[in-house]
């Protein structure tokens, strides 16, 4: 917002420096920080903050808010899909899912996506900008407040490519896991990437403890390049080498996401080739029946084909499961609600 400071994207140390450099006592920073994580979105409602500090904050800063533009609730499994808008009117999607172990949220990291995967609805809406850490936090906080729940797991698998917004995503991870913030542990966070190889190495060096989920979607470069433009820059061999480094460096097993597209990547030969690729990697394959996206012509593999694929992988000691489909009646897959919003004249 113009030249105002995005105060919710600050760590406590950064906020402390910001406050003291402008002539206010150090302890005021912790008071402000506490209010921010009590979902206060107006400086005037920070009751123990003096008037002169409130005036300074209002003239120098803003509090990012994720507002609910649309909300869909599945009648089958209570999955909730949100379209959130931010201070500049841009919108992203998030999905809250209920499991036995608690609530998980799938959040967006960018408005749109540059990656252009042919089976994904998000890329068809173009790319606007990356999200700030505060805007990623806002998706979680607004959902928790709206549903009166506590989110226990986070998946960065919504709109956008997290590793294309590397610095902001890393800062978000530190903020959301902080004892002073939402206090959601790193081991309860999964980051999904289409495979920006240099950033995987960079992420490994940070030893954050998050789970890395790689969108593989093909057993060879020929198929992957047809469906995922990023594959023209980084080969599967390069990608798997980076994943191996991630496992060796962090001790965290990598999960490979594999969208099953009928007649494209779901044959017995595809399964055997994938098994050979992943042999000895100690990884897990998450099979995803591809979502129907208008204009792609792609169809999901049938249940029999999915099971045959799993059996071939299992015979080579490659663990695989079919991802449970939630929110099927509300198009809970990423990008579809935003696309409809744009068609109706929104941002």
Regions found by a protein language model. Give the residues of each.
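Auxiliary Fe-S-binding modules of radical SAM enzymes
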Residues: 1-92, 244-253, 258-347
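Glutamine-centric residue-chemistry signal
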Residues: 31, 110, 136-139, 306
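Generic beta-strand structural signal
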Residues: 80, 92, 103-107, 115, ...
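P-loop NTP-binding catalytic core
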Residues: 88-97, 101-102
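Canonical Radical SAM [4Fe-4S] cluster-binding loop centered on the CxxxCxxC motif
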Residues: 98-135
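Conserved alpha-helical substructure of the radical SAM core
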Residues: 123-153
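Short beta->alpha linker loops
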Residues: 131, 195, 218, 325-329
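Conserved AdoMet/S-adenosylmethionine-binding subsite of the radical SAM
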Residues: 144-153, 158-316, 320
């Amino acid at each position: 917002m113009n030249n105002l400071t995005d105060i919710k994207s600050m760590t406590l140390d950064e906020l402390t420096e910001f406050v003291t450099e402008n002539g206010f006592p150090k302890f005021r920073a912790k008071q402000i920080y506490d209010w921010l994580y009590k979902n206060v979105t107006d400086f005037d409602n920070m009751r123990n903050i003096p008037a002169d500090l409130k005036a300074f904050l209002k003239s120098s800063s803003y509090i990012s808010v994720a507002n609910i533009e649309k909300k869909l609730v599945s009648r089958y499994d209570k999955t909730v899909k949100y379209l959130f808008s931010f201070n500049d009117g841009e919108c992203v999607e998030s999905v809250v899912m209920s499991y036995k172990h608690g609530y998980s949220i799938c959040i967006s990291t960018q408005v749109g996506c540059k990656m252009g995967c042919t089976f994904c609805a998000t890329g068809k809406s173009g790319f606007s900008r990356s999200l700030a850490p505060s805007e990623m936090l806002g998706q979680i906080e607004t959902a928790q407040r709206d549903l009166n729940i506590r989110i226990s797991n986070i998946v960065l698998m919504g709109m956008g490519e997290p590793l294309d917004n590397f610095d902001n995503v890393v800062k978000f991870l530190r903020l959301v896991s902080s004892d002073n913030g939402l206090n959601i542990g790193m081991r309860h966070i999964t980051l999904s990437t289409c495979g920006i190889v240099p950033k995987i190495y960079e992420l490994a060096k940070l030893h954050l403890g998050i789970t890395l989920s790689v969108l593989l979607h093909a057993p060879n470069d020929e198929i992957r390049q047809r469906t995922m433009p990023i594959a023209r820059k980084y080969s599967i061999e390069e990608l798997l080498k980076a994943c191996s480094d991630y496992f060796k460096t962090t001790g965290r097993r990598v999960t490979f996401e594999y969208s099953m597209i009928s007649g494209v990547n779901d044959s017995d030969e595809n399964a055997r080739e994938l098994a050979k690729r992943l042999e000895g990697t100690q990884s897990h394959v998450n099979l995803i029946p591809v979502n129907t996206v208008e204009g792609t012509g792609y169809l999901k593999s049938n249940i029999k084909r999915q099971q045959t694929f799993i059996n071939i992988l299992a015979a080579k000691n490659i663990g695989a499961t079919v991802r449970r489909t939630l929110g099927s009646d509300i198009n809970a897959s990423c990008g579809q609600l935003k696309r409809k919003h744009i068609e109706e004249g929104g941002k």
